[in-house]
Structure formats: structure tokens, C-alpha cells
């Protein structure tokens, strides 16, 4: 029995010993993962209980204390997560969710090939910077921390530092005694002076007393000596400079210089912890700096509702101005340097419900950042400083960009898992066919928009045919891109001298629009500029229209296209300072009148032959012919009237002889009745003796004889032309007469030798339209990609239709319409084209719209442009029979592809073309509208495919929306709503420079594109454009 009892006691001691060690080890590991202790320093001392009731609440012992992350932490936590509650008063009690939230923020995304071991290794060498002592007002400074502030080695925060502070030491360094501290104050906070906590203040019952003088007056300066001592050891943030929200709003100190940090610290000390009666107030709004997350560009968004008004800090440098001019203090009180604008307070009081709605929307910032829209930031302008909204907007774009990256990676993993599964219904349910499975398993490299992936892929093994290309799987792409990003991040961390976050340096290039106009970004910058230059609050109504705002943006491009907003703030500070000087200092001298030259009056220096087009010359002759000139001096009369028209054009560039002729004709012959339709030009020329003077009918407008001999084609063309279009004039003789009367030289027709040379140049032209093509010519049309064979069939089919169409009646009517102009044909010269365009520009325009090709004479034929146009007219699933489709098609293509760069690349031989740089697609082999290509591709894509869009495709869809609104009238509200929905979806992703869509967004995008494509072809294209 004695032996058994000894064994039991021994086992019991072992159990107690192991359980104690494991419990201690688990708690240490948990604290280490939460970032609350260091891996090396775990100095446990005899400290008071953490739950001591008499211990004053300071930011160091706050349950929501978070250390500032360093370089490695930025790599580990590239995206901030949900943070503690918005109510600063409720942030006193901790919860398991908050601890798990902080744990998740450090473990969310850790790009490391070695996993947890690498994480622990980096955790040991992680540099934890010091806490800003000036922000911790009554805290005790330990001796080792005091030494570390003046040494070069990094200071290490010991474990449970907040619990090691003695109550006596804390009372010694504090300005308040224990008996003066009311426990109710720590729960129900009094609003701090100058609106530092006014975000929560408006939900209290003290709204009427906030703007009273006792809250507005300047706080007293207490103990300047101690303030200067503490300011001398101010700890700087991780990147060497403050974030936009924590910077001072001074107009004289640069927001980029480190010199402004001392002023910010001293100004912060003036407002932190004391009211006007020099009594200490527990300010838990100071906690937002200590609780900052270095993985965020805006480092204090944990309690961002306080940061809105904390951004405007009292500026010491304005004390001298106030003392010199007491009368300017009310104006200074409402300026941009005084926190915050009185107009913002007034807007919150006048519209409390709108202020609550904005506040409620911004609460989604941390919970679900994708639920916010760009309009929310514009709605917040009446209530907050525009600079703060810019900083929040930049942070929002960055957060949503990272969120979309995460969703894109998850969708790629799910897609690869579905492709590898045995029940593979994703790829059309094909089983057993090895060739088909091999083709479908190839990953389309054109869908890769990740620069790390595209740089990492080895394209040297690529061959001419796409079926034999080596393309890695999606998991290999993810693995390689992750490793490459990790390697580049480590290289960047070693090269950076400062402790700026890797997340900011790596991603800030992506979400910033470098010079490109973006409406919300430009509107916020314009609001900040207006707010600080006029010293007034800005609302949405004060922002310019989109066209005017775009002009303002590019006019100030050197200020608005920087990488970070601080550079623009520096410019705004200078402008605000100069505007304040102009407002406060009254100058006795009157301003000088600046006379600007009219930029649109360039026609005043033009000669007479450059003022009007050929069609306008005909209109001037018709206008003069309405009145009978003297028979003896007919040419002199026409010349003098023409010089008067030239003077009108020089005086007013908007002068149009066509409009003036129609008005004079309607007044003389139609009794100014607007309801009577205006006669066609052919009708006027047929009855010209009834309308024009006798002199004009005899000496200017010459009739051509009726054609009675020749081929049946020529006779039939002349008759139809007279009946339908009134082509009864001898156009060549009429134009020459007009030029002679106006003092110009006549245009000579081409000689027989020139016509013979031209015919010889095109003797084999029609033979080129046959089906016999060499391999190089087919490659020139279609390229070498996998869809080249399909597109080649479409091109040849269209050529067959073109040959058949020439034998139809419509071909004869086109020839009659345009004086044998049907493109391309050998019976057409530039002389005939210019002659017809002189009298019938609208008819020629309609003919050009129907044909879709440009009849510009020999260069059009010699350069092979007709073949390019023939390929342009063969995009699949496009209504090429609509009347105005080619006109819109040309507008689209000219804006996207200026010149023939893409076509020039396509004209190379297959053995010389560099497929790594350019692989032609059938839709953009020549100057094809990229908008139609994207819409067409979205219409036929399966939503299960990889949802990636290239950047130029998103911009092309934006241009499509703009062109439809600019050139056409959208008839139905349904189509307009579709356009708005598509544009809003694209704009949200283009602002973030992120074009990765999840399944739901991609299906919605495809539905928008399909409906818009159908509605555009059925309703919009067939309407006349506005430019007509």
C-alpha cells in the first residue's frame, strides 16, 4: 500500500507539472500570435491585476491596443479586416471577436513558400517601432524605453507593458489625482473641444450647445516646457511620415516634409486631455493612433469617425495673424485651417438624417467595402472635409481592389477543381475524346491580366499554332505568381531604406489613375481645391459638369496626376494660402483688365480660298442668284457679294451660307412657313428658272443634254438619275462657272493619258476578288491563331456575296446615285468624286454609309485599303445592313486604333512576326471597333469560363457608352438603364484598376452586354445621329 500511494503521488505531481507547462505554453503562443508579446522578451514581473478598478484607462492598457506593424507585417497582412466598434465609448470592453479579428488581420494572407515556419522565423526578427509618447498623455515612461528613444537600436515593447506601470508612478506623472476621476466620465464622454469627437457627439442630446462660445474658444496653453520636452522625443510612424488623415491642414507647412511633425505633435498636445478649465478629460479618441494598422494606407481607420474632424488641427502659425488683426478671427474661424468648417456643423444640424445615413454607409467600410459606391463619397462632401474624403476614397479603392483579387484567386481555384473532377460538365461534357480534352485544358493566355504571371511565363517555347503551345495549369500559375510576388516583396524590403509598408509600395501603382480622367477622383480634388481657395464648404451642386470637370482636370494635370494625394495637397495648400492673403489683405490699386485674344477667331487671318468648302461655294452662288443682278456687271456683282460673305465668315466663324440660303428661300417662296417641307436640291435644279435669276440660269447653272446613245447601262443610269435625284445639271460646267465668278481658277479634268495609266494600274483588280489566295494573303487577312480558319471562311463568304451583289439591281442604283461610284471599281476617279461631293454631300454620305468603304481614289486602291475595309465589313454577329452602322463603326475604330499599327503587324510574314508581342485576333486584325469585339465576345462566352477582362476591353466598353450617348438618341428607358448599369459596374472596377469578376458579377456583365448589343442593333443604329 505504501508503494502504491507513493506512485499515485508521483503520477499526480507529473500531471500537475505537465498541465501547468502546457497551459503556460498555450497562453504564450496565443499572445505571440496576437502580436502582444515579443518572441525573445517575455519579462514577467509582479504587476497589479489587469482588472484593477482604480487604474486609469490609458491607450497603453486599452483592451484594443494594437502595435504598429513593420515591413514583414505589411507583407503578412496586405488587407485590413474588420476592426473594433465604431462607438469610441463602447471600445472599453474587449471581446473574443475583436481578439480573433486582430489575429485574422495578421494571418490573413501570408505569401511564403515555407509556410508557418517562415512566419515564425520572421516573427522573431520583426521590428516593432515605438509607440508615440505624445499621444499617450498620462502614461509612465519606463527607463529602458527612455534609453531606446535616444539610441539607434529598435526598442522592444515588453510583455504586458501596460500592466507593469505602477499606479504610484502613473499618479506621479499624471496631472490628475485619483479622487478627481469620476468613473462615469470614462463611460459617458464629454465632447472634446473643437469637434475632435463630434462624429459621436451628434448622437447625444447636446446638439444645441455644441457651437456655443465655450466649446469654440481656444484652449489654454498649460505647461509649455513639458510639452516641448515630450515633443523632442516624438516617435515617428512606420513610414517616416503621417498618413493623410493624421497630417495637419496647415497652408504654410508642406504636408510631405517631416518638419510638420513637430507642429502636429504640439498641436495635438494642446487639445488632448484638457478642456478650457485645465481639467483632464479621458480622451479615448487618442486611441486611434495607437490602434493604427500599418497595413492600411490610412492608418487610423479603426475609429475613422473621429478622424474626420481630427484632420483639421489648430495651426500655431496663425496666432500672429490673429493677434495683429482681431477682426479677421471670425473669418479664420471658418477657414480651412480651423477644425472643422462651421458650414459642416451647420449642415449636420440642418440635415441630421442625411448625416446619419452617410455615417451608416461609411460603417460598411470595414464590414463590406464592396457595398460602398463612389456616390457615397460625393454625398459626404457637405458634412466633412474634402481632403478626408479623398484619403478615404483612396483607401476604399485599395481595399476593394484587394478584395477582388482574393475573389479572383478563389474563383480560379474553384475552376481548376471543377476541371480536374471526374464529373466534368464544365467543358461541354466531352468524354473520351483526347484531342478535344487537350484543347479545352489549355489555358488561354490572352485572359491573363496579372503582370506577375505574364512576366513569369516562358513564351520562348511558343510556336506558330496555338494548339501546340505549352501553357501551365491554373494552379501552376497561382503558385508561380505567389512565389514571384513573395520574392519581389523581399527584394523591395531590403532595398527600402525607410520602413514604408510593402503593401503600399506594391499596390499604390495599381489603384492610382496616372493622368487619366476619372469623374469621382477629379470631383473630390476639385471640391478640395474649391473648399480651400474660397474658404467655404462644398456640396455636390458646386462641382462642375463632367465636360467642364474634365477640362479642369487636364488643365491642372501636373497637380492631380501624382502617385499620392499629398503632392496635390501641397499645391492646394499654396493656393489656399494665396487666396486667403487676397481675401484678407485689401489692395488699394484696382486690378488690371486682362484682354484675352479670341482663340476661335483664327479664320480672320485666312484667305478667301480657305474660308469655305466646295459645297458652301455652291450655296453662296444659290443665295446670290435669288436676287437679279444688273445685266451689265453680273460678274462684278457676284464677286462683291462673295467678298461680303467672306467678311461675315471672318467676323463670325459660325456663319453658314447654307442656313442663310434656306432661310432666304423659305421667306421668299414658302412665305416663312416652317411646316412646309423644304424641296430637295434636285427639285430646285429642275425648276431653277422659277427660283433663280435669269442671269444665273443662263451663265451659271448649265443643263446637260438627255443621253440618247451609248450602252443600256449609261442610258438607264442617266434616266433614273434625272427622275429620282434631279441630276439635270452639267456639274463640271456649273462648278467652273461658279469658280470663275468668285475669282478662282477652275479644276482641270484628268487627261486621257492619266486615265489610261490608271486603268493599267487596276487591270488585275477584279481578279483579286477570286477565291484563289496564297498562304501569305490568307495570313494577311486572318492571322495564324486558332480561329483563323473560321475567319477565313467568313472573309471568303463575304467576298462571294460582294461579287454576287454587283450583278443585282441595287448595284446599278448605287452606280447611278454616285456617278458610277461603287467602291472599289476602275471607272471612278477622284475628280468625279469631288465633283459629286460639291453638289450632293448628303447623298454621298448616305451612299458611303451603305457601302462602308471610303471612295478616295487611287490611294484607296493602290494601298490595298479596300481589302482591309472588306475584312472590316465581315465581323460575325453584326448587323452590317443597317444604314448608319459603318459610320459609327468608323468613329469607333478611329478613336481606338489611330493609324494602322495593328494592320502593319499583321502584314508581316509568319516566320518574322513575334508572337510573344502580338497575336492577331480576327476582330482586330485590321482597324476594327474593339467595342464590338468585347460585346460579341461577352455574348458568346460561358459564365463558367475564367472571368477576366483586359484593361483595354473595359475602356472600350466605356467608349461604347460615351459614343452612343454622344452620337445617337437612345429611344427607350430600358436600354438607357441597361447602359447605366453596365457603366456603373465597369466604372467601379476601372477606378480600382481591377478587372477580375466573380461569377455573379460576370453573369450580370454578360447579361448587360447581350441586352445592350441586341437593343443597339434593333433600336439605336437605325436612328439618325445627332451630328446630322
Swiss-Prot record:
**Any one Gene Ontology biological process term?**
ascospore-type prospore membrane formation
Asked if the record carries the keyword Ubl conjugation, the reply is: no
Q: Where in the cell is it found?
A: Prospore membrane
Topology in the lipid bilayer: Peripheral membrane protein
What intrachain disulfides are recorded? none
Q: Which UniProt keywords apply?
A: Membrane, Sporulation
Q: Does the keyword Membrane apply?
A: yes
State a GO cellular component annotated for this protein: prospore membrane
Q: What does this protein do?
A: Has a role in spore morphogenesis. Involved in the assembly of the forespore membrane.
* Protein name according to UniProt: Sporulation-specific protein 3
Protein source organism: Schizosaccharomyces pombe (strain 972 / ATCC 24843) (Fission yeast)
What lineage is this protein's organism placed in? Answer: Eukaryota, Fungi, Dikarya, Ascomycota, Taphrinomycotina
